[in-house]
Amino acid sequence: MLRVSITPELCEITFSARAAFSKRSWPFVAALSIPWLLCAGQRSIQRLSGMGTLRRSASAYYRFLSEGKWRLPVLFRCLFELIVRTFKLKELTVVLDDTLCPKWGRQIYGTGSYFDHVRRPRPGFIWGHNWIVLALVIRASKKACIALPFWIGLYRPKERCAPGQFRTRHQIAAAALHLVRALFPGPIRLLADGAYANDSLVGGIRDIGIDLVSRLRSDAALRMPAPGRRSKGARGRKAKHGAPLPKLSSLARSRSAFRKQRVSIYSKSVVLLVREFEAYWPALNRVIKVVITRDPKRPKRIAFLFTTDLRLGAIEVIECFAQRWTIEQLFSVAKLQMGLDTAEVRKERSVVRHATLCMALITWTEVWAYRVHPRSWARPFAQKLAWLRAETITSTVFASGPRARGSHRNARDIGNLFTSATTVA
């Protein structure tokens, strides 16, 4: 069985997480990581152990996930610091979202019944895991951005939790964001979908200086930021908030209040009709900036956005919220190319650690590609994974064969052939 070796650049990146594993568990990290990145099909432990550089039984590899010594908070901190250090970040754009992974079997830890709104061919209920992910948005070029994950948590339904252990998605996310604030003192901006735009999350991060950019409910009941002037001698208690505003649908129909703005979203430069104003939202108990956008070519395409940072302009709000799409691309990569939803794990530790290692490998691969191919870093993840596979197989074949004229060229041809075969698979 071919036993591949890790490249020096990837070894240095992986070694940044050394403190998260014990002395006995650490050798299994590299032994599992490289086969994981090279495999194109089902990533079973039996298959990965055969390609690992560590000569241990398959049972030892299974025990690494279920019984090995991991320090998950330390691993999350190492991933976070690696991203901040590599890209020299002075301010953070954090994107938050959750994704569903279908599972079969009642004895798998953390599973539950969830409604999948994007399921094909039609929305419906699935049985599986619900993962909450935090990632840092990094600008790869003038138009492209990439989300690098550094934290992942499992949401468990209330009926599957012991008394006193249940936490909502918003509580889990708020606790993780408090850890981010403890690690980074600079400005932090959070991007999230409309499902996280409520006081249970915003109220938890308000005191630590994290602002939110999200989608606004179309039925949100907004009011004027400040109450109007009272007439002299008026009776009753002074109003705390302003008068109610019209419905958002009515505000969106007022054409005179919109102006044309050119924005850069989703790798394109487009012209939108934009309207912005400040309003008090009782659901958050604070004043927010509301941005309404309309497509001049498609009048029915209307979006309602908001931010808790009143200093942001309308263009910044629109372009920031467009960067939230990077985490959707991350979920696609994690499932289709890294096997997040095809894990053969059942116990509590194995389930959580498998997902954590999957996200860590994505971040390590992205950082490796940035260091080795900085000018082409905006390419899709599949291209970066192909580069890593080609270089790994080339170095492995060249190191295992005789030194002769043309041996490096032959090794490179074998590496490219392996990459083409795994890409097709």
What are these regions (language model features)?
Residues A17-S25, W36, A40-R106, G110-S113, ...:
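Electropositive nucleic-acid engagement tracts
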Residues L48, E91-W104, L134, R189-A197, ...:
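Short, conserved catalytic/metal-binding motifs centered on acidic residues
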Residues L100, G313-V345:
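Short amphipathic alpha-helical "interface-anchor" segments enriched in bulky aromatics
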